[in-house]
Design a protein with these regions (language model features):
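Glycine/serine-rich anion-binding loops at beta->alpha junctions
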Residues: 44-67
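Polybasic, low-complexity association/targeting segments
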Residues: 1-14
């Protein structure tokens, strides 16, 4: 399955929140090798940390990029890692207009589908970011070997 299919599965069928959906879907697609217990760390980021702040789907994307990029700590690869995160935030914002849940929900939330549209757009932003990084560094694998 591709990322969008996995997003639909985890969000609609398994009923995970936005950040949980992104990490679970990406774990399957990009073989992140995260166990179920570790992925629970993203649970509290749903609905912008349940306070309308930074979108949980975007936080999920940043978590995925962290797992793909970082060998030991961010400071060891800061210039490349910073660029990847900034690209992801840019791609996300271009599609959804903001990074704050409270500003995204009014135009993206559906009473029946909830935040599915936002999570799908976040997945697209993640995929675009990975593609841009792979192109820049002439990489073939989804795993970003800047480690």
């Amino acid at each position: 399955m591709n990322l969008q299919e996995q997003i639909l599965y985890y969000y609609k069928k398994k009923k995970y929140n936005c950040s949980e959906t992104i990490i679970h879907a990406a774990n399957d697609v990009y073989s992140l090798n995260l166990d179920k217990d570790s992925m629970k760390m993203l649970a509290g980021f749903g609905s912008g940390m349940y306070s309308g702040k930074t979108c949980g789907a975007l936080i999920g994307c940043v978590a995925v990029l962290s797992k793909l990029f970082i060998k030991e700590k961010a400071h060891d690869q800061l210039s490349e890692f910073r660029k990847a995160i900034q690209l992801c935030v840019r791609n996300f914002t271009e599609d959804l207009g903001d990074t704050e849940c409270k500003n995204i929900r009014p135009h993206s939330y559906d009473p029946n589908l909830h935040c599915l549209y936002t999570v799908q757009k976040a997945g697209m932003a993640l995929e675009s970011t990975i593609a841009e990084i792979k192109k820049e560094y002439e990489l073939e694998s989804d795993m970003i070997p800047l480690k």
